[in-house]
C-alpha cells in the first residue's frame, strides 16, 4: 500500500548539498520561472502548504525510461508524497540499469540545482492539475488529493481541471507535458507494478515497472 508519511526531508537535503532554501522570491503564478524550473503548485498536509513544487525544464528533465528493469519488489518507494525519499530508496536499491527513471532524475544538475527527483503520486497529480496541456475532458474516477493545497476531497469533473493558463505548458508549448502520454510516478503500487498518470484526461493506473513511460523530474523548496 502507498505510504502517506515521511515527506519532510527536502530542506535537509538541500542544505546538505550546499543549496539555499530560497532560490528566488516566492512564486505566485503557476508556470512562472522559479528555482531552476517552473512553479507547479504546493503540496502539504491537511491543506497547509509545506513545499513549493518545481517542474524541471522539458528539454533536460523529461525523458522516456523504465521504472525498473524487472517486475520485482523494491524496498521502500511507496510514499505518495515523498518523492525525494522514493527516489533515494531506488537509487540505494540498484544502479541506473536497474532503476533508469530514478537515476535519471537524481543525477540531474539543472539551473544550478542538484536535488531533482522523481515525483511521488500526489506530487505528479498536482503537476497534472495545474499544468494540464490540453482541453480534453477529464475522467471522473480519480483526482482527489489529500496533499493538494487546498485539499481536493472530490474527483475531477469533465471540465475541472481545465487546460493550464501557463502558455508554455499548453499543447505545442516548449515546456508542456506530452499530451495523452503516460508519466511515471515514483510510487510503487505492488511488487510488480508502479503508479502512472496520463496527461490527457488524467487517468491513473498501475502497470508493469519494466515498461518505458515518460518521467519528468521535479524539485521542491520549503514554504
Where on the chain are the PLM-derived regions?
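Compositionally biased non-globular segments, especially hydrophobic aliphatic-rich helices
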Residues: 12-14, 19, 151, 169, ...
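N-terminal low-complexity, intrinsically disordered "leader/linker" segments enriched in small/polar
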Residues: 2-25
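Extracellular adhesion/carbohydrate-recognition regions
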Residues: 19-112, 116, 181, 193, ...
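An exposed tryptophan-centered "aromatic clamp" motif
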Residues: 102-115, 121-198
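Disulfide-stabilized, aromatic/cysteine-rich ligand-recognition loop
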Residues: 198-223
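Short, flexible loop/turn elements at secondary-structure junctions
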Residues: 59, 123, 188, 219-221
